[in-house]
């Protein structure tokens, strides 16, 4: 089964994976001949790059295990911890200690524990929010099972990466364990997609959840607001003169009504809570664009509406952006669940 995984890297990490004259990344290709692996171009002013690895499941997971090994290799003058301006590059999980390892394996020798500690690494896996819901599972049962089964640590970012529907799943463990947990993650995602396709095919109304059409990948970039002032590659742009921060979120047409709420109340509450202005792009020939029908689920042929968030602080704009994306993800999941129920009712009829 072919898969493609994307990993978020800092500039230092990307340089380490590439190696002198590309030798390190070439060694990963040589060890896993059936994968395509590459790193996005360096964007001036951005502190991150994205590694993409594609191929058969086993080969891709094995190659990413090799990437963890490369990242674990110490570099000259490398600081133990780097603090990054870009939130997603800072580790979500605490650095493991000898005491942590002793607690899980009290019989192990000091030498063995030191060796194990040196082998523990990280991967920042980029995952669509819809897929992450399946990985976490109901009540977090699925992700707990993965942690216990493979002896790794897993944590997901609450926020979406800028201008995307992706979140970060950080994996901490030894390379072999990270490889195994990635194999299970691939299986979970494949099973979920298979069930969704089956439910869609069996649904007499042919209703789409809109999941795949509106997934948006993250790419390293600098955002700009209407005054063309650039920002760090966080999730907002800003104007130095007015201290005004902005962000844009693209929402599928068929979900606009649900996110606006009855007579725009849901959007009004979001504005009030985050202390931001949220401007919704009008539909063509639509003068009353705030009063959308929250139950409108008409197919939209991929049309998107732009929501512009404006605030006096990056924190409030980030909060509004994240909450808007989360509301969209919740609505997509709600419609997905309704589709499943329709399919189950059809089977029992």
From Swiss-Prot:
The keyword RNA-binding applies. It holds the Pfam family KH_1. GO terms for molecular function: mRNA binding. It is found in: Cytoplasm; Cytoplasm, P-body; Nucleus; Chromosome, Telomere. Residues 194-214 are annotated as: Disordered. One of its GO terms (biological process) is intracellular mRNA localization. GO terms for cellular component: chromosome, telomeric region; nucleus; P-body. Keywords: Chromatin regulator, Chromosome, Cytoplasm, mRNA transport, Nucleus, Repeat, RNA-binding, Telomere, Translation regulation, Transport. Residues 2-67, 120-185, 244-324 form the KH domain. SUPFAM superfamilies: Eukaryotic type KH-domain (KH-domain type I) (SSF54791). Binds RNA. Belongs to the HEK2 family. RNA-binding protein involved in the correct localization of transcripts in the cell. RNA localization is a widespread mechanism for achieving localized protein synthesis. Involved in structural and functional organization of telomeric chromatin and regulates silencing at the HMR locus. PANTHER family: KH DOMAIN CONTAINING RNA BINDING PROTEIN. This is Heterogeneous nuclear rnp K-like protein 2.
């Amino acid at each position: 089964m072919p898969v493609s995984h994307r990993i978020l890297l800092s500039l230092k990490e990307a340089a380490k994976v590439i190696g002198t004259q590309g030798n390190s990344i070439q060694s990963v290709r040589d060890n896993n001949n059936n994968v395509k692996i590459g790193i996005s171009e360096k964007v001036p002013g951005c502190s991150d790059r994205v590694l993409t690895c594609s191929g058969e499941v086993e080969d891709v997971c094995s190659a990413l295990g090799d990437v963890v090994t490369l990242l674990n290799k110490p570099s000259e003058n490398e600081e133990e911890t780097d603090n990054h301006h870009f939130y997603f590059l800072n580790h979500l999980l605490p650095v493991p200690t000898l005491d942590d390892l002793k607690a899980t394996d009290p019989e192990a020798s000091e030498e063995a524990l030191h060796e194990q500690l040196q082998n523990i690494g990280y991967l920042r896996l980029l995952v669509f929010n819809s897929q992450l819901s399946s990985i976490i599972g109901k009540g977090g049962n699925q992700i707990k099972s993965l942690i216990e089964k493979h002896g790794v640590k897993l944590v997901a970012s609450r926020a979406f990466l800028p201008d995307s529907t992706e979140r970060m799943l950080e994996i901490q463990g030894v390379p072999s364990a990270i490889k195994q947990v990635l194999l299970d993650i691939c299986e979970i995602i494949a099973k979920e997609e298979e069930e969704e396709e089956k439910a869609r095919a069996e649904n007499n109304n042919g209703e789409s959840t809109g999941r795949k059409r509106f997934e948006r990948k993250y790419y390293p970039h600098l955002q700009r607001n209407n005054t063309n002032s650039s920002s760090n590659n966080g999730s907002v742009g800003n104007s130095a003169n007015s201290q005004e921060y902005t962000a844009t979120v693209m929402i599928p047409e068929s979900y606009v009504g649900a996110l606006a709420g009855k007579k725009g109340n849901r959007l009004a509450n979001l504005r009030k809570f985050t202390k931001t202005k949220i401007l919704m792009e009008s539909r063509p020939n639509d003068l009353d664009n705030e009063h959308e029908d929250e139950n409108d689920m008409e197919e939209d042929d991929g049309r998107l509406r732009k929501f512009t968030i404006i605030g006096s602080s990056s924190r409030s704009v980030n909060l509004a952006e994240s909450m808007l994306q989360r509301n969209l993800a919740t609505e997509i999941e709600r419609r997905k669940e309704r589709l499943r129920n329709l399919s189950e009712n059809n089977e029992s009829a």
